[in-house]
Amino acid sequence: LFTRLALTRAALLAGFAVACTSSGHKAASDSTVSTATAVTSTGTPAEEPMMNDLGIDTSTAPPTLPTELAAVAEFGENLYDAAKAGKWDNGRAIMDSLDRAARSLPVGANAQSADGLELPRVLDSLRQAVSDRQRVAALQLSNRVTYLAAKMSPGYHPQVPSDIALLDYSGRELEIWSAQRNARMLKRTAADLSRTWDAVRPDVVRHGGTTAAETMDSLVTRVASAKTAAEYARVATPILDHVDVLEGLYTKP
């Protein structure tokens, strides 16, 4: 997943470069046009397009997922893996990168949404958990970061639907709560997983993922029928692995 996120971010940057080049060619071809204010057929001034620094008309172009928000999700997951493996020195370095990415989020990156406002508080608690080597707290909080990043993403029309990221989040929740033998949280996670999958399944099928969807159906059914922490734990890894397959449907050339 980290590699795919990095590729997605690289693709975004490549797209920005193409947009800049295209904008430059357009500017050159338009150089002979009069600079007088454009008017409509009725003689009233025409509305000028809202151009951003990349020369993209933001009044019509869909907003692009900020690379900083993609980085928050990536570093959150990286930190989860570091805490899971007990690699605390690495975890502290990832925490620094996560903080930098979060501080660099654009003002428009849903920063004032409920999820955006929660993020700084979660990061403060996460940094303390990493500093104190509190494994369970670090796992819970780093996974919460991935959840918040996913919830802040839909308005940007990410290449991979945010619900796919939420399936990944739920798989990690199954790991966390099965290890804690927390039946209440496991049932809650199972319900969340089912709702998320129901929401995104049609889009997966539209992207040629009929077989992948059927496999995910069976995994979600296994979670729904699980009775013990061990049963939840056994299906967590297959779900996380299969989310990689689902993501591949959206990132393949």
Across the structure, where does each feature detected by a protein language model lie?
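Bacterial N-terminal signal peptides that target proteins for export
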Residues: L1-A10
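C-terminal motif of bacterial Sec signal peptides marking the signal peptidase cleavage site
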Residues: F16-A19
